[in-house]
Every structure is written in C-alpha cells, then in structure tokens.
Amino acid sequence: MKDRTQELRTAKDSDDDDDVAVTVDRDRFMDEFFEQVEEIRGFIDKIAENVEEVKRKHSAILASPNPDEKTKEELEELMSDIKKTANKVRSKLKSIEQSIEQEEGLNRSSADLRIRKTQHSTLSRKFVEVMSEYNATQSDYRERCKGRIQRQLEITGRTTTSEELEDMLESGNPAIFASGIIMDSSISKQALSEIETRHSEIIKLENSIRELHDMFMDMAMLVESQGEMIDRIEYNVEHAVDYVERAVSDTKKAVKYQSKARRKKIMIIICCVILGIVIASTVGGIFA
C-alpha cells in the first residue's frame, strides 16, 4: 500500500498557505479602504471649511454697495472648489456603494462588509449635512441680495412686492429693473448700479445651485434609504452593549457567589476538623 502521508502533509501546508494569503489580501484591502475613508473625510472637512469662508465672503460683498472684483473672484473660486471637491466625494462614495452591492449580490456577508457599509453610510450622511449647510448658505445669501434690491428700488421711488420682485428676478433681464426709474439724480444711478450688482450675484448663485441640485438630491435619497439600516445597526449595537453589561454584571455576581460558597466550604471543613479533633480527644480519654 502506497504511503500518502507526505502527500497529505504537502496538501495541508498548501491549504494553510492559501488561508494566510487570503487573510493578508483581506487585511490589505481593508487598509486601503480605511485610507480611502480618511481621504473622503478630508474632502468633506475641506468643503465645510470652504462653506464657512463663503459665508464670510457673502457678508463682505453685502457690506459694500459696489464690492471689489477681487472679493467676487475669490467667492467664485471657493464655489468652484466646493463643486469640484463635492463631485470627487460623490464619485468615491458611488464607487464604494457599487463594491458593496456586488458583494451583496454574491450573498457574501462578513464583518468587513458590515464595517464598509457603516462607514459608507456615515460618510454619506456627513456629506449631505455639509452640502445642506452650503445650500442653506446660498439660499440665505439670495434672500439677502433680494432684500437689498428691494430697498434700492424703494430709494428710486419704485415699490414692489416680494412676488413682483421674484418675477423680475426670474426674467433674467437686468433692464427690467430700470424701467420706470427716472435717472435724474446720482442717488438713482447709484441705486440702479447696486441693483444690477445684486442681480448679477443672484444669477451666478442660481446657476451654482442648479449645478449641484442633481448631485445633492441623489445623495440625499441615498442617505434616506440608508436611514432604516443605520437605525437597525444602532439598535443592534445598543442591545449588544446592554447584553455585554448584563453579562459582566452576572459574571461579577457569579464570582461573588462562588467566593462566598468557597468560604463556606472552608469554614465547614475547619469545623469538621475541629469536631474530629474533639471527638478523637473524647474517645481517647474514655479508653484511657
């Protein structure tokens, strides 16, 4: 009969090597994934910083009837940078999402997959929060520009309702603001100049909002769909923590009871020994 011991040993070593290779590959994959997570988080933080800077530029522009071109250019650069960075974040989150869906399609389930899903959901929510803040900042700036236009129209003697002003803005025609205004004073000319400036700012703003709208809605819908999953994960984590705390408490009680039982056992043994000595002494005395 042929001895297959060496063959089986070689096959086992080969299987062990394969297991090690798979583990190393998986660890390397997760390391690369966490590097990607940190990169995305850095991009989101950068957007948040730029949004705060945009707010400061808005205030500076509104504080001046005729803001300098440098400030306006810096604002446009910030908005352009936010758009580019947001598109990068969206693309990377989409890539992670597709990778997760592929593994789910193969019915794979692992701790690594759950970690990736949780990280993806967390980043998506943070991204939408930052972009929501940016959207709110833009909307607030539009309202403030609109208020300045309305006040300047009043200076020229032209009163408009909010609805009428909105219609004028939507027309996209700056000449509509000059109709009915008598340009017979420097005040009227200055007021019209600021109106045109604010109208130009609103047009740029609306273009920016329009460009980001589809991306924002896409990510918002993704986060909403993930809401239930996140809630389930948080529920399971909370209950797992409760379970662990109860287990620790029960273990402490068990140790305490075990310690008491051990002490009782020792005391009983000591009593038995003493009793044995007494009995032995008594019996010895009787026979003596």
Swiss-Prot record:
This is Syntaxin-1A. Belongs to the syntaxin family. GO terms for molecular function: ATP-dependent protein binding; calcium channel inhibitor activity; calcium-dependent protein binding; chloride channel inhibitor activity; identical protein binding; kinase binding; myosin head/neck binding; protein-containing complex binding. Residues 1-265 are cytoplasmic. Residues 68-109 form a coiled coil. Residues 192-254 form the t-SNARE coiled-coil homology domain. Pfam families: SNARE (PF05739), Syntaxin (PF00804). SUPFAM superfamilies: t-snare proteins. Part of the SNARE core complex containing SNAP25, VAMP2 and STX1A; this complex constitutes the basic catalytic machinery of the complex neurotransmitter release apparatus. The SNARE complex interacts with CPLX1. Interacts with STXBP1. The interaction with STXBP1 promotes assembly of the SNARE complex. Interacts (via C-terminus) with KCNB1 (via C-terminus); the interaction increases in a calcium-dependent manner and induces a pore-independent enhancement of exocytosis in neuroendocrine cells, chromaffin cells, pancreatic beta cells and from the soma of dorsal root ganglia (DRG) neurons. InterPro entries: SNARE, Syntaxin, Syntaxin/epimorphin_CS, Syntaxin_N, T_SNARE_dom.
